[in-house]
């Protein structure tokens, strides 16, 4: 089969390898699509956490079950998506209901081979069957929708609340749509890439900014009605977190969703105490796959504006380059794995 492997920082190798054999309790997936996440780019650059080289990247995927080793024969032939989190189920974190913090965690695309290939194995318990009418192309965005659902549920967004989103990459654009679906009013989206700002406006943001440090604070000072009740931070830059702390209303809430392990910076955290803020971190899809599938199937979340650049897997160099440079209007590169 064809597969893409990250061998070392900045080293992506395309080649052929044997089709993997599913272990007991696993399924073999004929992959359809996989989109490139910001975490994949960090993994490629070697600035991520909890990963090992070499590894086949990819965790935002869709495909078809072709074989099951053990119970689950009814899954064969079904189109599916699946949770990247392969938890042990027996450690303290799993016992607390937080498998994403599993002490023995394996993650598709980071510590076990993921979806940038023709075939992949995954525990059958991680799979979710797609309804008729939801295409494999659209379904590769189920995982990021689930991430957004988990984040919005973690921080809380109530009907009528004003929401600012910082960072309009794939996750940021999903966050704004989920917050809007929950009844939030998307007052501002900050994003340096013009084409992504345009997508945010198309999806209903009342105002968009360039993401320049201090710009959101200036906007809120001029237009107090834009002061957010909730800020969803998806860029991962410390300067953006600082701005979120400064602009959110007293008693407001901040959700930290994006992160960059290579970015550090000083922060004036006294605002958190003085304004009595609540800050919540959110990691992973949090078991929200069924809800994400339902929202996509009912057309309540738009994915086509995000799927900007399609590539065959052997054109991985260009796919990664455009995504890294955010060039040519790139919102999200994605692979058609059957091309």
Curated annotation (Swiss-Prot):
Key words, A-Z: Metal-binding, NAD, NADP, Oxidoreductase, Zinc
Co-factor remark: Binds 2 Zn(2+) ions per subunit.
Domain of life of the organism encoding this protein: Bacteria
Catalytic reactions of this protein: 2-deoxy-scyllo-inosamine + NADP(+) = 3-amino-2,3-dideoxy-scyllo-inosose + NADPH + H(+); 2-deoxy-scyllo-inosamine + NAD(+) = 3-amino-2,3-dideoxy-scyllo-inosose + NADH + H(+)
InterPro entries: ADH-like_C, ADH-like_N, GroES-like_sf, NAD(P)-bd_dom_sf, PKS_ER, Zn_alcohol_dh
EC number: 1.1.1.329
Pathway membership: Metabolic intermediate biosynthesis; 2-deoxystreptamine biosynthesis; 2-deoxystreptamine from D-glucose 6-phosphate: step 3/4; Antibiotic biosynthesis; tobramycin biosynthesis
GO molecular function: metal ion binding; oxidoreductase activity
Chain residues that bind Zn(2+) 2: 88, 91, 94, 102
Named cofactor requirement(s): Zn(2+)
Enzyme class per UniProt: oxidoreductase
Record: residues binding Zn(2+) 1: 37, 59, 143
Family: Belongs to the zinc-containing alcohol dehydrogenase family. DOIA dehydrogenase subfamily.
PANTHER family reported for this sequence: L-THREONINE 3-DEHYDROGENASE
Protein name: 2-deoxy-scyllo-inosamine dehydrogenase
Source species: Streptoalloteichus tenebrarius (strain ATCC 17920 / DSM 40477 / JCM 4838 / CBS 697.72 / NBRC 16177 / NCIMB 11028 / NRRL B-12390 / A12253. 1 / ISP 5477) (Streptomyces tenebrarius)
Gene: tobE
């Amino acid at each position: 089969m064809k597969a893409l492997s990250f061998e070392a920082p900045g080293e992506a190798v395309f080649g052929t390898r044997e089709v993997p054999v599913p272990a007991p309790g696993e399924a073999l997936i004929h992959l359809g699509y996989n989109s490139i996440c910001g975490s994949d780019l960090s993994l490629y650059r070697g600035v991520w956490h909890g990963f090992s080289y070499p590894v086949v990247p990819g965790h935002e995927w869709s495909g078809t079950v072709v074989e099951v080793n053990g119970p689950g024969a009814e899954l064969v032939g079904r189109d599916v998506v699946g949770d990247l989190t392969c938890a042990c189920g027996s450690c303290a974190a799993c016992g607390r209901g937080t498998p994403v913090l599993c002490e023995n965690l394996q993650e598709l695309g980071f510590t076990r081979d993921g979806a940038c290939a023709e075939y992949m194995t995954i525990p059958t318990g991680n799979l979710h069957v797609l309804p008729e009418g939801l295409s494999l192309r659209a379904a590769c965005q189920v995982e990021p929708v689930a991430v957004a659902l988990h984040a919005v549920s973690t921080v809380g967004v109530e009907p009528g609340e004003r929401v600012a989103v910082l960072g309009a990459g794939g996750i940021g654009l999903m966050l704004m749509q989920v917050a809007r679906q929950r009844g939030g009013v998307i007052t501002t989206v900050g994003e340096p890439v013009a084409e992504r700002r345009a997508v945010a406006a198309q999806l209903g943001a009342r105002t968009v900014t360039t993401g320049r440090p201090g710009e959101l604070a200036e906007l809120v000072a001029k237009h107090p009605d834009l002061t957010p009740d909730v800020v969803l931070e998806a860029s991962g830059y410390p300067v953006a977190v600082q701005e979120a702390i400064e602009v959110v209303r007293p008693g407001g809430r901040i959700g930290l969703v994006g992160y960059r392990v290579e970015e550090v910076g000083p922060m004036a955290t006294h605002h958190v105490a003085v304004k009595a803020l609540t800050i919540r971190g959110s990691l992973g899809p949090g078991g929200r796959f069924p809800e994400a599938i339902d929202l996509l199937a009912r057309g309540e979340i738009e994915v086509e504006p995000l799927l900007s650049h399609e590539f065959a897997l052997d054109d991985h160099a260009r796919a990664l380059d455009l995504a890294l440079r955010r060039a040519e209007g790139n919102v999200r590169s994605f692979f058609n794995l059957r091309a």
